[in-house]
């Protein structure tokens, strides 16, 4: 179906081999679209979660409510800027090869496990920061997972087209939910008018665990796919060992360095330093044991991380804020949420939780 369009694409007669895409450009574009939709869903649901937390905490003081309203209004203004960012991320994920995407996934998995294990009492704050920082890594995880699962399929483009359509639908629904909650949650939750807002009011604390379970599933599949994709480029066990040994050492040193550098720095500063250090380390590694195509793709990863993190710095600051360190649903179970009611007929007292 796409053979006519593929005939106009550059071939190895005009471009060097390291500039040629690993797969069909149409397949790469569909994989990038799925990855960008996954990033959009993650950002929308994280904004909903942090909005619920801030809304619950701002109800305690009028000053907090006045200070929180402009921030929420600014977050809802996406429009053309949001669509431009979406298509930029789609293009970057389409260009980045499956090999470099696999390396990004493995590095993120190792860094996340190490960070959560050493987080201590700041576990929930660290978890929110990890979810915000994982945007481009989620796109790489979905892209390399689709590359691995559909490799060798006779109708690969059709499967990817269906996956892209479903991802687009989920991204649109998540965006609509975000705008609905930010605009009407306070009114609907107070008047018990909207089923969606009432569900979030009663079960909003389940949103973060649901996101965590989804991320665990996504990166578990992506980790298996990444190891398989990387091993496909080696003809013998000696070549594989020569690649995996410096890779493991480099990843371990990067994780240790970033854990030490996070102390005493602000949230935005930590994120920018982390991106520069880990992608810089990957570039040095690829210059040593990789290919020129890998170096080019890592440079594209710099742009991808920037296009994901810079527009969502407010989201990262909200995830790092001290106002959301303790879940507001836990606070509502204290003594202030208790009331005593007496039955007029039997005289029995009941203790109610609001």
Per-range role (PLM):
Residues 1-36, 40, 300-354:
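Cytosolic, intrinsically disordered low-complexity tails and loops
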Residues 1-167, 354:
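N-terminal signal-anchor/initial transmembrane insertion module
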Residues 42-54, 169-179, 258-262, 306-327:
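Transmembrane-helix exit/juxtamembrane "anchor" motif
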Residues 49-53, 67-78, 120-133, 182-191, ...:
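Short, amphipathic, aromatic/basic-enriched membrane-interface segments that mark the entry/exit
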Residues 125-251, 257-258:
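Generic multipass alpha-helical transmembrane bundles of integral membrane proteins
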Residues 144-149, 259, 281-295:
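Hydrophobic alpha-helical transmembrane segments in multi-pass integral membrane proteins
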Residues 155-157, 243, 290-302:
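Loop-to-transmembrane alpha-helix initiation sites
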Residues 245-259, 267-286:
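Hydrophobic alpha-helical membrane segments
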